[in-house]
């Protein structure tokens, strides 16, 4: 029987305006094809592949962190009707992973390169993996003797760090995330001219939400400037219609505001990715684990993608904080306007015994916080107790980290 643990969970009612009711709000999302997101996606894909290999061959996930991926932009010559990639982008995978177990070598670098290629092939249809990118692995080596490995049921935090989460999303946050998902999802069927490097910046002033969208075009699907601008107009209309599904606020949409028709300046690419022409990327420089960059909310600067999913609290606690915040809002009904969660680790402590879990709640007017405090504490305690459940969800690709 599991020993009951007394966790340091602090629940506090705070009096401040929730984000949704403030005069100004700014929210950003870097789409899956943005160079920073490409780095995140590859880092996480490599971690998943290594984890699966370790589990299959050794029965457990061995130590690794593959959170150092750099995307170095190439050079291209995009043209209406189809251009060419002149120099491939360069992708460097680094970090550290267990490469020797009981004297037996593990093909870490081969696993990493295959994972990166598979990820790119799965997500970016117009990228020629063999010619448009160069992928290199410089993952550092580590070795262990499994006979002396510590009990996996007693995993300790490998860092003193913190995770941050909040709920619920505001309309602006919901729309910014949904817009990128829409453009890189269902919209591809009707507008194949639009590539995967999408960035959405949301700016709300009172009850008007402005969306500025940078959308890379794929040149071979666009015959001339007239078609470019026709697609642009259609894109504005479709984004607007989709955004209005999520809000009663006014929505204004701007697409590729850097275009200059008279000077023949367009956002054209060969592959649908700006990394083909000098745009670089790094792990952790883009979206937080909830898929957004939110300067009006508390955030952690931790790079979660590629970190090991067993003991790295920078990954676990950021995702867990968001789960706890959302579950509190869901289970405690309409009395809550906003929940902020921060979980702090202390190196050497079990990951399910954080140094503190701080939960701040903004309630609706005339609500007695004492009605909810015990339930909120219980929700947080339960989710922390089951933090190990997140590991398999990371390995199975069921949890996003960017």
Swiss-Prot record:
Q: Which GO terms describe its biological process?
A: one-carbon metabolic process; S-adenosylmethionine biosynthetic process
Among Gene3D superfamilies, the record links this protein to:
3.30.300.10, S-adenosylmethionine synthetase, C-terminal domain (3.30.300.280), S-adenosylmethionine synthetase, N-terminal domain (3.30.300.340)
Database matches in Pfam families = AdoMet_Synthase (PF01941)
Q: Which catalytic reaction applies to this protein?
A: L-methionine + ATP + H2O = S-adenosyl-L-methionine + phosphate + diphosphate
Name any cofactors this protein relies on: Mg(2+)
Q: What class of enzyme is it?
A: transferase
Pathway note: Amino-acid biosynthesis; S-adenosyl-L-methionine biosynthesis; S-adenosyl-L-methionine from L-methionine: step 1/1
Task: State where ATP binds.
Answer: 140-145
Tell me one GO molecular function of this protein.
magnesium ion binding
Q: Which UniProt keywords apply?
A: ATP-binding, Magnesium, Nucleotide-binding, One-carbon metabolism, Transferase
Q: What is its EC number?
A: 2.5.1.6
Q: Which family does it belong to?
A: Belongs to the AdoMet synthase 2 family.
> Which HAMAP family does this entry report, sorted A to Z?
S_AdoMet_synth2
The entry's function note states:
Catalyzes the formation of S-adenosylmethionine from methionine and ATP.
Name listed for the protein in its UniProt record: S-adenosylmethionine synthase
| Annotated organism of origin | Picrophilus torridus (strain ATCC 700027 / DSM 9790 / JCM 10055 / NBRC 100828 / KAW 2/3)
From the broadest rank down, the organism's phylogenetic lineage runs:
Archaea, Methanobacteriati, Thermoplasmatota, Thermoplasmata, Thermoplasmatales
């Amino acid at each position: 029987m599991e020993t009951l643990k007394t966790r340091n969970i602090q629940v506090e009612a705070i009096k401040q305006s929730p984000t949704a009711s403030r005069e100004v709000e700014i929210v950003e999302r870097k789409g899956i094809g943005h160079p920073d997101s490409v780095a995140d996606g590859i880092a996480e894909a490599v971690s998943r592949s290594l984890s699966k290999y370790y589990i299959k061959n050794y029965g457990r996930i061995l130590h690794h962190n593959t959170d150092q991926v750099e995307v170095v932009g190439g050079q291209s010559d995009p043209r209406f009707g189809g251009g060419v990639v002149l120099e491939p982008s360069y992708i460097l995978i680094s970090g550290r992973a267990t490469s020797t177990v009981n004297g037996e070598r593990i093909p870490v670098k081969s696993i990493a390169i295959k994972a990166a290629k598979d990820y790119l092939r799965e997500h970016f249809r117009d990228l020629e993996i063999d010619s448009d990118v160069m992928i290199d692995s410089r993952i550092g080596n580590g070795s262990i003797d499994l006979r002396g490995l510590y009990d996996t049921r007693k995993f300790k935090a490998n860092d003193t760090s913190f995770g941050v989460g909040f709920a619920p999303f505001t309309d602006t946050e919901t729309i910014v995330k949904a817009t990128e998902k829409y453009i890189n999802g269902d919209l591809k069927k009707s507008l194949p001219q639009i590539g995967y490097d999408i960035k959405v910046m949301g700016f709300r002033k009172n009850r008007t939400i402005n969306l500025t969208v940078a959308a890379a075009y794929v040149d071979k699907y666009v015959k001339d400037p007239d078609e470019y601008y026709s697609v642009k107009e259609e894109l504005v209309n479709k984004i607007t219609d989709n955004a209005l599904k999520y809000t009663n606020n006014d929505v204004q949409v701007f697409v590729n505001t850097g275009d200059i028709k008279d000077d023949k300046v367009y956002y054209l690419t060969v592959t649908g990715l700006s990394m083909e022409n000098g745009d670089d990327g790094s792990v952790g420089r883009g979206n937080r684990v909830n898929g957004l960059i939110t300067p009006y909310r508390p955030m952690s600067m931790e790079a979660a993608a590629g970190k090991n999913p067993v003991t790295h609290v920078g990954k676990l606690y950021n995702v867990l904080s968001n789960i706890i915040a959302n579950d509190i809002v869901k289970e405690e009904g309409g009395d809550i306007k906003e929940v902020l969660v921060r979980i702090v680790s202390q190196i050497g402590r079990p990951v399910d015994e954080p140094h503190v879990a701080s939960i701040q709640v903004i309630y609706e007017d005339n609500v007695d916080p004492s009605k909810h405090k015990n339930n909120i504490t219980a929700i947080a305690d339960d989710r922390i107790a089951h933090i190990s459940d997140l590991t398999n969800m990371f390995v199975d690709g069921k949890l996003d980290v960017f």
